Each structure stands twice: as C-alpha cells, then as structure tokens.
C-alpha cells in the first residue's frame, strides 16, 4: 500500500474518535474500520523549505530512530552538529503527551529553518509503552500520531508513504499498547547534481523475527521500484535485526546460548537475517554505508534497554558511492542518552 496524497497538515484524530475505537470490540473488523476511518493514516504531510537549497554532487545523509523526538533542544543540537543535507527520521510524535503534545518534526524543521515530510505509522490509542503509561498517568494525548519522515533544506520531491503491513497486531493490546496502523517506509526524492536519488526512511516491526523482516523487505523494495524505477536509492532504517524470532526470545536462556555460540551474531546478523540476501540480490550493498564495528543501541537514563547490544539500524545503497560512514552517539551535552538508538550518517555520490 503506497500513499501519495499530500497535504499541508494531516487531519488529526480527535479525542472522541480515539475513544470510540477504544470502546469498540477488539476484533479484526474493528481494526479495519478504524484504519480506514483515520484520514491521517492515508496522507503525507509536506512543508517545503522557503528557499530550497540545491545539492551538488555529494550529500551527507543521516538516519535516526529519535525515540519520540521528545528531547527537543538536545535533539536539535545533536542534529545540527551532523551538518547533514537530509535527515531521515523515525519514531516521531505528533500530539503525544510523552513528548509534550508537540508536532515534533515540524518543531525540529522550524529550529533548523528547513522543510519536512511526515507520515503517520500509528494512531496511538493510549499513552505509549508501560514506562510511559506510568510516567504520564492521568494525562491525555492531543492527537495521538506517531510516524516518520525527513527534514531537509533541499527539495524533497515525490514524497510517499509505504505501509509495510496492516496486520493489526498492535490493536488488541497484547504488546501493552493499543495502536491503529502498521509499520512504514517513508519515501522522497532528492537531486544530486540534477540526478534523481530516492531516499527511504524505514521502521520495521519490533515484535516479529527474521521471517517477517524478509517479507517487509520484499514489500519495501517492490514499492521503491514501483515508485522510482531505475534510479539510485539510499535506504536508512531501524530494521530490528535481532536475529531471533519473537518466540525464541521469550524462552529464557535462548539468546544467551546463541550468543555463546556466535558472539558476533548481533553485530553481524547477515547469516541469520534473510533480508540481507534479498537486498544483495536486488542490487543493494551495506559495507561501505555503515560503520560495521559499531552497535547502534544504547541504554536510556532509566536503565533500559540493557545489553547485549548489536547493530539493528542500517543504511543500504544501490547505484551510489558511499563514503565516511559514521555512528554518532545519541547523547545530550551531559552525555545522557536522548534515544535508545545511535545516529547513522554517510556521504553519498552518484556511482
């Protein structure tokens, strides 16, 4: 499912609309009805920069799972320091109390004096995960949107949202959150020396395993080729490549045993994640795009998540020359984490 309808402002789900979904029977038909009814899930919000900057033969691109983008000032300082031409972002809130009921990507774009593209991954029916439910008990979301997108001073052309799945697996609350929507890849084109290049900012499902990640990858690549056939591509995302099926992770000792057999498994998951073989067959590479020795996870100030950590965020390229890949610590001026994911950055040029 590819959404190409654009708007200057998404239609925000009202408190009453979200409450009505919460009170409906927890069955598939309720999910489908809710998914179809929330207009915010079926459009892409776009604001162009006032004076778009023309890119030359090279561009510095960064990807970050910003974990709600809730630390506004610290996140802006971190991202300004990257001097990136385009920021590819996921886990962005719009109207969530956990991030101050702000429009986080618009606020970031305002701070940077740039344009943005935003698409909604989920309509959140609650306050967030168990930590957030406890921290913000008794408060309310103003809109309840969570998604991904881009920020850039350059023109972001032909924006689109690809819905990687609409299973409704978050609808019944089995993962301690109730949500309407599904994982997404946000697409937009930039121009390097007037040549079109497609960027994809991606967030894969965190509660499945390698087999489902393969399916999401196939869907994503097919939609990329349908949207922008024959042009160079850079994909950045949180791919959650933890190398285990959800059922395996639930069995005590399974992860520890697998790491004892292969201590590099989480840092170099290629042999355990068939999505890498598919990407290779479809012409994508990753070694030149990534700092291959650096994990991309870190512990938040509340002590979660805990090691062992690995590389779950990746950049993949096709038809591009990648150089100077970096993994940048997602911390504030005191060294405290502002996300549980590090920032990835790379310089791209036409191959």
Where are these regions (language model features)?
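Structured beta-strand-rich core segments of catalytic domains in phosphoester-bond hydrolases
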Residues: 3, 24-47, 93-194
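Active-site beta-strand/loop signature of hydrolases that rely on acidic residues for catalysis
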Residues: 60-65, 75-101, 117-121, 151, ...
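Metal-dependent phosphoester-hydrolase catalytic domains
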Residues: 1-46, 161, 210, 224-234, ...
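Eukaryote-specific, low-hydrophobicity, charge-rich regions
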Residues: 33-66, 76-86, 115
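Soluble or luminal CAZymes and related metallo-dependent hydrolases
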Residues: 70-71, 100, 143, 179-182, ...
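Active-site-proximal loop/helix segment associated with metal-binding centers of metalloenzymes
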Residues: 179, 197-204, 263
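Acidic/histidine-rich helix-loop elements
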Residues: 14-23, 50-72, 94-97, 130, ...
């Amino acid at each position: 499912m590819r959404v190409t309808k654009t708007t200057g402002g998404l239609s925000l789900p009202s408190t009453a609309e979200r409450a009505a979904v919460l009170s409906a029977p927890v069955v598939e038909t309720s999910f489908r009805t809710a998914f179809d009814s929330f207009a915010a899930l079926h459009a892409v919000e776009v604001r162009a920069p006032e004076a778009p900057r023309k890119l030359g033969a090279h561009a510095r691109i960064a990807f970050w799972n910003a974990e709600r983008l809730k630390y506004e000032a610290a996140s802006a300082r971190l991202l300004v320091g990257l001097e990136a031409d385009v920021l590819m972002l996921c886990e962005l809130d719009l109207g969530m109390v956990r991030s101050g009921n702000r429009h986080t990507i618009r606020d970031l774009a305002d701070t940077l004096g740039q344009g943005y593209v935003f698409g909604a991954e989920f309509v959140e029916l609650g306050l967030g995960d168990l930590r957030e439910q406890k921290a913000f008990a008794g408060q309310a979301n103003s809109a309840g949107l969570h998604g991904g997108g881009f920020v850039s001073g350059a023109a972001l052309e032909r924006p689109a949202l690809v819905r990687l799945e609409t299973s409704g697996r978050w609808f019944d609350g089995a993962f301690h959150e109730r949500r309407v929507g599904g994982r997404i890849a946000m697409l937009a084109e930039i121009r390097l020396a007037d040549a079109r290049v497609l960027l994809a900012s991606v967030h894969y499902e965190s509660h499945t395993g390698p087999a489902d990640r393969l399916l999401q990858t196939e869907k994503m690549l097919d939609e990329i080729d349908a949207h922008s056939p024959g042009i160079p591509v850079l994909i950045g995302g949180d791919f959650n490549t933890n190398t285990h099926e959800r059922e395996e992770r639930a069995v005590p000792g399974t992860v520890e045993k697998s790491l004892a057999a292969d201590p590099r498994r989480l840092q170099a998951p290629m042999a355990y994640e068939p999505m890498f073989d598919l990407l290779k067959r479809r012409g994508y590479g990753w070694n030149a795009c990534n700092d291959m020795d650096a994990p991309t996870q870190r512990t938040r100030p509340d002590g979660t998540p805990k090691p062992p950590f690995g590389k779950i965020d990746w950049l993949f390229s096709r038809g591009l020359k990648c150089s100077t890949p970096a993994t940048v610590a997602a911390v504030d001026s005191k060294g405290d984490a502002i996300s549980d994911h590090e920032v990835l950055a790379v310089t791209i040029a036409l191959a």
